[in-house]
Amino acid sequence: QRQMCIRDSDMRETETKVLPVLEMSCAVCAGNVESTVQALSGVEKASVNFAAGTLTVTYNPSVITLEVMQAAVQAAGYDLIVEAEDPVAMQEEKARMHYKILRRNTIGAWTLSIPLALLGMVFMHVPFGNWIMMVLALAIMIFFGRSFYVNGVRHALKGKANMDTLVALSTSIAFLFSLFNTLCPGFWLGKGLEPHVYYEASGVIIAFVLLGKLMEERAKNSTSSAIKGLMGLQPKTARLVTDGREEEVPISNLQVGNVVSVRPGEKIPVDGTLLQGSSSVDESMLSGEPIPVEKNAGDRVLAGTINQKGAFTMEATSVGGTTVLAQIVQMVQSAQGSKAPVQRIVDKISGIFVPVVVLLSFLTFVCWLVIGGESYFSYALLSAVSVLVIACPCALGLATPTALMVGMGKGAEQHILIKDAFALENLCKVDTVVLDKTGTLTEGVPVVTDSYWISDDNIRYLDVLYTAEQKSEHPLASAILCWLEESGAKVCEAENFESLTGRGVRIQVEGVTYWVGSQGLLDIFQAGIPEKVRKQIGQWQEDGQSVVFYGQETRLLAVLAISDRIKPTSAEAVKELKKQGIEVHLLTGDGVRTAERVAATLDIGYYKAEVMPNDKEEYIISLQQQGKKVAMVGDGINDSQALARADVSIAMGKGTDIAMDVAMVTLITSDLLLLPGAIRLSKQTVRLIYQNLFWAFIYNVIGIPLAAGVLFPINGLLLNPMLASAAMAFSSVSVVLNSLRLKFMK
């Protein structure tokens, strides 16, 4: 059973954190950071999302600290934010500064590159033109492209290479060759060759790469808008009440047990319990319901929800990363940072990409010289530089994470939480959905609508029934308890309570055994049903109501009719699933007539009644043996075995249970109509991932041979390094823009 933990309480006592990473310039950098952290003792799993600039790490805090990880990452030439009170805010501030510097460098590089290109391609005979171009190119390299050379050298000293290496190497070769020809033109003139210079290539390559990075940063910022929106729900400060006085403090200062004051129109800062006052609270960010919820003393309120009317005080019960909102944010971040199975292959390719490209560039240079000798030296150099420039590991590195970020973020906005890329990929392959009835297709708030007592002395039996149901965890137990409380039933002394899995409960009072549950208990206790009672049961079942049997020893005492309304959106959800070609099945522990009624109402062709938890698991296995990809949808209580067995486990959440949910997919609002939307979203996201990867691979497969001059013998076409740099910049941006299309898909 797959599960993502925010805090795993198993024997390893591992924790999972999402930490911002700085100074990464391409996908190769992400791989370097990931391998550096993964190699540390005490780290169970590390995954770097280049698009988000984050490290998701699962580690044992008793073996390794975050500071040790930070030191290792810094030693590798990058930075990891671990000590800040608000690491996300710090990352955003650094990202803003980085973007500001990047924009300034891009504008500066283009300001000098335009006259440089004009001098090199149009006004080639201007006096001292070569010297002017040399100064312009050198200024671009030093003032606006310095980071490429600093990072390239830094990684080279560590025996590593990345995209900065390719840019630094290509522009340096073009500049040094041009400088040699400017200083020693006679070397080539003596051989009867023209001493060409390519200063404009050095400058324009840097300008195009910077422009591509600027556009990429803008686009990547859009991919993370959903998670930023979730983070923005939580206020930065809270009004702490101490000895009757209010003081505004950062929410990071709040502790469990603190008393906080909340005024009308304000966002609630932490999870807690309302102490004084009453109000209506907008919980749509969690529940999806636009109608405000009335809150009174003793009620639970959640961080990020909005207090609409009255002022109140509350006691903090969850702060920081333990609030429901923080748990959701961490879940989405972890999901965005997860890797699709295909990404493992991409990572391996990215790891060797730069060395292979450098080798191809060298072979290109050698081949040109072998074919044409010294007269082709300029062609050889230009082609080698073009190969270095056009190759783009970033497009490969961005293909999967950008699509995942947009897809997972869009899901969160629609109240759909997908745990990781594995779940996403499995969800898109689902062709069969198995639905539990109670709480999935129905409201999950059953009520007792009728009762039939065989015994006359039912007052005593009401107390016993009340005691038995108080200990039961079955969804129908709450309905019976509410009904009994209205009848004035009380708890009585009891012993030997036993839960009969899938059937009901058994309890002893004063040495006498009582039982309550499904019709299967009649066989266990050999109790019969009077004919007049049987007719009443038949009528209830015809109406789609569930029947609960209550007895003493071998005698049936009473039967209760319980109704659980079908959700308004269930029929539409089933219809949408069928439109997508998905086979829908219904499993329920209720009787056959109830199952028939629900299946007929919702137009579900396959159903099975009177199933116990192990029956549900066997049903899932039987479908899988037929070659079907099965998703199981349930409430996670009685369906745990089936959920674990299914290819995709889907839980119907209720907003406040999110942090404890271990299903692959959680529908936060318990609205089944979210399910077809989740499957559609998974298909769209996976399709985009493969589109991005196809484009990234095809771009490099076609671009590198073109840059090497494969068309030159055919039509004399040789790709200019400046055009190669433009193509490289476009490839990364196009991948991100393609991922952003997902935002607007229905």
Question: Model-predicted segments: where are they?
Answer:
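Flexible metal-binding regulatory segments at protein termini and peripheral loops
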Residues: 3-128, 154, 245-246, 326, ...
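Signature of the cytosolic headpiece of P-type E1-E2 ATPases
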Residues: 8, 476, 485-597, 612
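Conserved ATP-binding TGD loop and adjacent catalytic N/P-domain core of P-type ATPases
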Residues: 14, 31, 418, 509-511, ...
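Conserved cytosolic catalytic loops of P-type ATPases
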Residues: 41-63, 199, 228-322, 422-465, ...
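Transmembrane helix-loop-helix hairpins at the membrane interface
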Residues: 101-237, 348, 451, 719
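Membrane-embedded alpha-helical bundles of multi-pass transporters
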Residues: 122-125, 157, 176, 410, ...
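Juxtamembrane coupling segments of multi-pass membrane pumps/enzymes
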Residues: 203-264, 295, 345, 418, ...
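Conserved catalytic phosphorylation-site environment of P-type ATPases
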Residues: 286, 382, 392-468, 623, ...
